[in-house]
Every structure is written in structure tokens, then in C-alpha cells.
Amino acid sequence: MFDVVISDIEAREILDSRGYPTLYVKVITNTGIFGEACVPSGASTGIKEALELRDQDPKRYQGKGVLQAVANVEKVLLPALQGFSVFDQITADAIMIDADGTSNKEKLGANAILGVSLALAKAAAATLERPLYRYLGGAFSHVLPCPMMNLINGGMHATNGLQFQEFMIRPISAPSLTEAVRMGAEVFHTLKKILQNRQLSTGVGDEGGFAPQLASNSEALDLLLAAIEKAGFIPGEDISLALDCAASSFYNTQDKTYDGKSAADQVAVLTELCDRYPIDSIEDGLAEEDFEGWKLLSETLGDRIQLVGDDLFVTNSALIAEGIAQGLANAVLIKPNQIGTLTETAEAIRLATTQGYATILSHRSGETEDTTIADLAVAFNTGQIKTGSLSRSERIAKYNRLIAIEEEIGPEAVFQDSNPFSKA
């Protein structure tokens, strides 16, 4: 094949699932083949994430416009990349990082850089007439991830007063991804009927989970147990529970307390919940700045359940290495837009995996119809994925893509939960 190079890059301002602006990017090759990507955006963000560039113009989208990021793609990144091989992902990502020149991509914006990075990979895959997961992962990419399904939303993803952000189910006994989706959907619809019977709201939050007014985190977990059982499954055997506490959102940095409680109290609360419920994964149980609290949590529960660092690590290899050295957590949440390039995302996964940490590919609360993370989860054999509830089309699109990938791979497809504490 003759050299296939980057000929043009187009970008535009579009809307995400919350109605806020984000970027669409299209990388076009000299053969006319192209790749497209839409960039997600988070509501609950880590303080060390790569910067998502916003215009800060109060006259447009309440300051959340991304026209400057669009301009950076077309006026800075295109000239820097034009003529480079569409297959040289590492070099292209390095060129964009150098063009930005900052530690957190604040000059050009991680949203601008990531859009180009993902669209480039898709253009390369399309050129070879391969699906993205096969282009990136090769012949050994055949593991379908266990989904962590966010059925009840709280925290910064809803306005219902729940302290924790996500109350999830994990269909651990499913023999396939397709069956895992079925199990999740059946529990979702059963939960809806239970909420209706109790005259609780069936409105949904940012990630498609229900957002009823509940008195406590325990009440949310009780509802999940009731839905699992009524749907015909056994809690802890067929379907386990998982939490995203997003503890940084209720952490007081001045007195280092969690809604007035100490780190030890917070660990005790989580331990008690694990004693009462079939929970096998907790994300961001302590705040990202509370290293001592994380050490206590890891010492207390690290040999019982999966402890996932999201805000703690923000998909940053340096922070992951630091956390591993200190014995913090035992799993890493992977969000490409936290770091800003596909190359750095892959490096974070490689580092975590080689050190025995599980990895979970994740969406953001502000999503689009883009299904790239489904392909990435399979490409890198993460074994787990977070992509929301069983409602809202921007969430369902990822599940539908995973179902299609499983069918494409055929008999070699393996549904594998990478959580080492799963009881299935």
C-alpha cells in the first residue's frame, strides 16, 4: 500500500448528552478515507485531569462553548500533522503534545487533542478495512468486558440528595456480553416498576440511571437488591453490586472530613456496607487528595473487594505509578479524555495491568453517540466497562456496539470479568 497520510482535519462544535458543547473531529486521508470522533465531557472531574478547553464567553452556552478548541484543531493541529502517516499514532500524539507544550494540555485543550487522536486511529482502521478494536489490539483482542451498569444515580449526576454518585450492578454470572446486557435490562425495568409501585420518581440522571429521592445510600442498595431478586436473579451469585462514591465531591479539604466524618469513619461506613451487601467494587471511596485515607481503605478492604481509583489516578501514568508505589487502590478507571491522547491512554492501561491492577474503560456523564470506548475495552482486553444504565441512547449505543463486536468475533469471543474479587 502506498503512503496514506493525513490530508485534512475538520472540527465543529456539537452538543453532548447534557446539551453542552463538545467537539466533533474528522481526520481525512489523501485517499479520501476518514475517521470521526466525538469527545465526551465529565461533570465530576479530578483536579489533575487534562484541561478541557472552554471559551468562557458568557454570551454563548453560558461560557461553555468550544470554538477555541475547534480553531486549535484546524489552525494548529492540522498544520502540525498534515502529511504524516495515518498509521503512526504514537508520533502523531507526541506531535500534538509538543504543540501544546503544557503538562495538562491547557493551551490547546485535551478535548481538541483527544478528538484528533481518536479520529486518527479510526481513519487508520478504516484504511485497512478493520474494526477499530482489531486495528488497535490485533488478533488477541477477543475479551468482552463485564459491564458495570449504573441503575441509580446520585451525587453530581442527579439532584436527589443521594451522597454517593453511582449505584451499579454487575451481571457476573452471564455467559456472554449479550446475556449480560439482557440481565441488566431486565433488572432495570424491574427496578422501574418497583419505583412506580412505591410512588418514587422514575426520572433519570445524566447516565441514564433512576434518580429518586431517597433517604440514604442503604435505601438505594436495598432497591437494587429487591430489583435483582424480583427479576429472578440471585444477589451476589448472578449479579453483584458496585459503588462510585465520588468522595471528593463531599470532602472538606480544610478539616479533611467527609460530611463531618473522619477518613476512618468513611472507611468504617464502606466496610459496613460491604458486610451487609454483595458489593465487590468501590470507586473513589476516599477523596483524591486524601492519601492517608486511601491507605487505610486499601489496608482494610483491599483484599476483599476491587478498589477503583478514578479521581485518584485520572488515567495519568505518573499518578498511577505513584499510587501503586504507595499501595493505594487495586484497580484503575480509564477515561481517555482525562489524559487527552490514545497513546497515553494505552500506556496507562499497560502500566496498571503489568502491576496487577485491574482496568475499567469508562464513559463520562456528558456523552455522545460515539462508541469508541466499546472498541477500546475490547482492543485492550480490560475485562470491565462503565457506560451507564440501560436507557438514554448515548449509553445504549455503547452496549449495542459491544453486542455487535461479540457477534463479529464469533466463537473466539470470551466474556471475562477482570475483577479478581468477583464471586461468579
UniProtKB/Swiss-Prot annotation:
Keywords: Cytoplasm, Glycolysis, Lyase, Magnesium, Metal-binding, Secreted. It is found in: Cytoplasm; Secreted; Cell surface. One of its GO terms (molecular function) is magnesium ion binding. Its main location: cytoplasm. InterPro entries: Enolase, Enolase-like_C_sf, Enolase-like_N, Enolase_C, Enolase_CS, Enolase_N. It catalyses: (2R)-2-phosphoglycerate = phosphoenolpyruvate + H2O. GO terms for cellular component: cell surface; extracellular region; phosphopyruvate hydratase complex. Mg(2+) binds at residues 244, 283, 310. GO terms for biological process: glycolytic process. It comes from the Bacteria. Its EC number is 4.2.1.11. It holds the Pfam family Enolase_C. Pathway: Carbohydrate degradation; glycolysis; pyruvate from D-glyceraldehyde 3-phosphate: step 4/5. Binds a second Mg(2+) ion via substrate during catalysis. Belongs to the enolase family. Catalyzes the reversible conversion of 2-phosphoglycerate (2-PG) into phosphoenolpyruvate (PEP). It is essential for the degradation of carbohydrates via glycolysis. This is Enolase. It comes from Chlamydia muridarum (strain MoPn / Nigg). The lineage of its organism: Bacteria, Pseudomonadati, Chlamydiota, Chlamydiia, Chlamydiales.
